[in-house]
Regions:
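Conserved active-site tyrosine of GNAT-family acetyltransferases
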Residues: 38, 133, 138
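Conserved acetyl-CoA-binding loop-helix of GNAT-fold acetyltransferases
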Residues: 97-110, 135
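Conserved catalytic-core motifs of GNAT/GCN5-like acyltransferases
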Residues: 48, 121-123, 139-155
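Conserved N-terminal entry element of GNAT/NAT acetyltransferase domains
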Residues: 3-30
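Short glycine/proline-centered loop/turn elements that form peptide/ligand docking sites
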Residues: 101, 105, 126-129, 146-152
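Conserved GNAT acetyl-CoA-binding A-motif
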Residues: 112-125
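Acetyl-CoA-dependent GNAT
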Residues: 24-87, 92, 127, 146, ...
Length: 161
């Protein structure tokens, strides 16, 4: 069962935007259908502005490092608008600095080039791997300091063309 939190701008149950009566709902457990609806509407709007079939290709992917049936490392990402977003790269702690992360990132870059991506982008925290990504040719284009406290979140990009 979903828990919904109501946020009222005034004492009224509803508010008006452009003569339409609406409620503003906050939920910490959004339903799959709500998430899919919002993403589809955002994508629909974006594609209406771009309208280039080459740019429209979109797919999710995973690159896994497995020992037998056990995942020892992996990279999740998404390709869209001629770019690749690396959502996460993880390697089992006992195998870090063994080359698995480099192999996963190299395979992702190969996939990005095959998919005609112009760039790869990602984010990482100061306690994770910003130096690792810089070693692979990524450049910091933004950062948020003290997020979380005493750490920095870095945003990096690698241009492929």
């Amino acid at each position: 069962m979903k828990t919904r939190f109501f946020f009222n701008i005034s004492l009224q149950d509803s508010i008006f935007f452009k003569n339409k009566k609406m409620k503003i709902l906050i939920t910490k457990t959004p339903g799959k259908e709500d998430i899919e609806f919002l993403w589809s509407k955002l994508r629909e709007h974006g594609l209406s502005k771009i309208s280039n079939p080459e740019v429209e290709e979109k797919f999710l992917f995973a690159i896994l490092a497995k020992e037998g049936e056990v995942i020892q490392g992996g990279l999740l990402g998404q390709v869209y608008y001629k770019g690749m977003h690396v959502q996460l790269l993880w390697v089992d702690e006992s195998l870090r600095k063994s080359g698995i992360g480099s192999s996963l990132l190299q395979k992702a870059e190969e996939l990005a080039r095959e998919s005609k991506c112009n760039l790869i982008y990602l984010d990482t925290f100061s306690f994770q791997a910003p130096k690792f990504y810089e070693k692979w040719g990524f450049e910091v284009f933004g950062k948020i300091e003290n997020f979380p406290d005493n750490f920095t979140r870095y945003f990096l990009v690698k241009r492929l063309l």
